[in-house]
UniProtKB/Swiss-Prot annotation:
Residues 462-489 are annotated as: Disordered. Gene3D superfamilies: Fumarase/aspartase (C-terminal domain) (1.10.40.30), Fumarase/aspartase (Central domain) (1.20.200.10), Fumarase/aspartase (N-terminal domain) (1.10.275.10). The keyword Transport does not apply. Its EC number is 4.3.2.1. This is Argininosuccinate lyase. Pfam families: ASL_C2, Lyase_1. NCBIfam families: argH (TIGR00838). The gene is argH. It catalyses: 2-(N(omega)-L-arginino)succinate = fumarate + L-arginine. One of its GO terms (cellular component) is cytosol. GO terms for biological process: arginine biosynthetic process via ornithine; L-arginine biosynthetic process. InterPro entries: Arg_succ_lyase_C, Argininosuccinate_lyase, Fumarase/histidase_N, Fumarate_lyase_CS, Fumarate_lyase_fam, Fumarate_lyase_N, L-Aspartase-like. Belongs to the lyase 1 family. Argininosuccinate lyase subfamily. GO terms for molecular function: argininosuccinate lyase activity. It comes from Synechococcus sp. (strain JA-3-3Ab).
């Protein structure tokens, strides 16, 4: 019988195995190619962990200090961009450990005392996502600011409002822009709620059942800036709800950016002509020399699908997993990283485009309002104010519009005698009532498009914007004994 051969490359679990892992299986199994992005967070988590091990007497002060110095050297290498993971390391955790052992010797192998890669990666992911949420919220804040600046310039610019992509009623352009600011404000708030769910420390949960060593999880959570510690070790290592919530929040951000992109694409067509693209944010055709294409907007619209896909992929991955950790969860990272990158890129591109890439064609917008029947509702409202039931008024105005369409004229072209032939309630003041600018100004109900109401809404939005200006992130709490952080409730 052949004698078993020892593994050629020691792995963090190789003691159980007599033979070597097939090299292609090793490559298939490895995640170092993408989870290296978690490197600074893995080092930060390890620094907090070793400080706790020393404070609890699980490691001697000398051992903890040696490991700390080694980790700080790795941290420096990461910051300088010179850290090179061992090519044999299967993941970011083992890459850090192998470098640590190379720096400080065998004592480095004590770093993993009292933890598992299961709670380690869960901690890394939460630290990473917490930072990225802050970055995305900052980008949302900046885009909201651009929308508010544009809205402040166009309170009294009017254009057709649409339902079913058919002209419906005239509105203020600022009102339209503020609608998108409202969407992004909700996105900003939503990500704040997701951050609260992310800000829970799972470190110390072990592989699934905790540890018999006298660790201090509250100290680790305090050092890493977490609000609380997880309550159940099984749940802590297998929970990816917060990733689903982030993907869902990211998907809604892209829904809103995609809707805005679609409208601007339409507005930039010759058929609409409401927007002109500047050279800074448009591209051309390799064949047709006259073209000026809205590629930035089309890419934002197109990238939305991949973000939706990552949400669906994660849900499908999670739906059949028994407790606790399963290797399937390795698949949670690439989609997350891509979603983070995509959302940030789209927010940046849209901010630049709205600031530098479009010019509103206000004369064309206002001319369009003069060319349609979007003031028909105001004729019905006029009759209602004269005491005529709305349904009767609605029916009558429909007949008037039908007559005008048949004759190729607009409501403003009807002389007063023709108005009176439809109903004796019409007087000279009907012409003021159907003037598009007056139509918009009259919409004074709360949340409406009336100029006065829009100015008030803009002031509220600007005040809200200033109140939510992102502050510089505070440093992590100083080293201290356990702070009595509560369990997750």
């Amino acid at each position: 019988m052949a004698k078993p051969t020892a593994p050629s490359t020691p792995r963090p679990w190789s003691g159980r195995f007599a033979g070597s892992l097939h090299p292609r299986i090793a490559r298939f199994n490895a995640s170092i190619g993408f989870d290296i992005r978690l490197l600074p967070y893995d080092v930060a988590g390890s620094l907090a962990h070793v400080q706790m091990l020393g404070a609890c007497g699980i490691l001697s002060r000398e051992e903890a200090e040696q490991i700390r110095q080694g980790l700080e050297q790795i941290e420096k290498e990461v910051a300088e961009g010179i850290f090179q993971p061992d090519p044999e390391a299967e993941d970011v955790h083992y890459a850090v450990e192998r470098r640590l052992v190379a720096l400080v010797g065998e004592v480095g192998k004590k770093l993993h005392t009292g933890r598992s890669r299961n709670d380690q990666v869960a901690t890394d992911l939460r630290l990473y996502l917490r930072d990225e949420i802050d970055t995305i919220r900052q980008a949302l804040w900046e885009l909201r600011g651009v929308l508010l600046d544009l809205a402040s310039q166009h309170v009294e610019t009017i254009l057709p409002g649409y339902t079913h992509l058919q002209r419906a009623q005239p509105i203020s352009l600022a009102h339209h822009l503020l609608a998108y600011e409202e969407m992004l404000w909700r996105d900003w708030q939503r990500l704040g709620r997701v951050r609260e769910e992310v800000n829970v420390c799972p470190l110390g949960s072990g592989a699934l059942a905790g540890t018999s060593l006298p660790i201090d999880r509250q100290l680790v959570a305090h050092l890493l800036g977490f609000e609380r510690i997880s309550a159940n070790s099984l749940d802590a290592v297998s929970d990816r709800d917060y990733l689903v919530e982030f993907h869902a929040a990211a998907s809604l951000i892209l829904v809103h950016l995609s809707r805005l992109s679609e409208e601007l694409i339409l507005w930039a067509t010759q058929e609409f002509g409401f927007v002109a693209l500047t050279d800074a944010c448009a591209t051309g055709s390799s064949l047709m020399p006259q073209k000026k294409n809205p590629d930035v907007l089309e890419l934002v619209r197109g990238k939305t699908g991949r973000v939706f896909g990552h949400l669906q992929a994660l849900l499908v991955t999670l739906k059949g997993l028994p407790l606790a950790y399963n290797k399937d969860l390795q698949e949670d990272k690439e989609g997350l990283f891509d979603t983070v990158d995509t959302v940030k890129a789209c927010l940046e591109a849209m901010t630049i485009l709205l600031r530098e890439g479009i010019q509103f064609q206000t004369q064309r917008m206002e001319a369009a309002v003069q060319e349609d029947f979007s003031n028909a509702t105001d004729v019905a409202d006029y009759l209602v104010r004269k005491g005529i039931p709305f349904r009767a008024a609605h029916d009558l105005v429909g007949q008037i519009v039908r007559t005008c369409v048949a004759e190729g004229i607009l409501l403003k072209d009807l002389p007063l005698e023709r108005w009176k032939s439809f109903h004796r309630a019409f007087e000279e003041d009907i012409f003021a009532a159907i003037d598009p600018r007056q139509v918009v100004a009259a919409r004074l109900s709360a949340g409406g498009t009336g100029f006065a109401v829009v100015r008030e809404a803009l002031q509220r939005a600007q005040a809200r914007y200033q109140q939510t200006e992102p502050a510089e992130e505070p440093p992590l709490p100083p080293s201290s004994p356990g702070s009595g952080l509560p369990l997750e409730s």
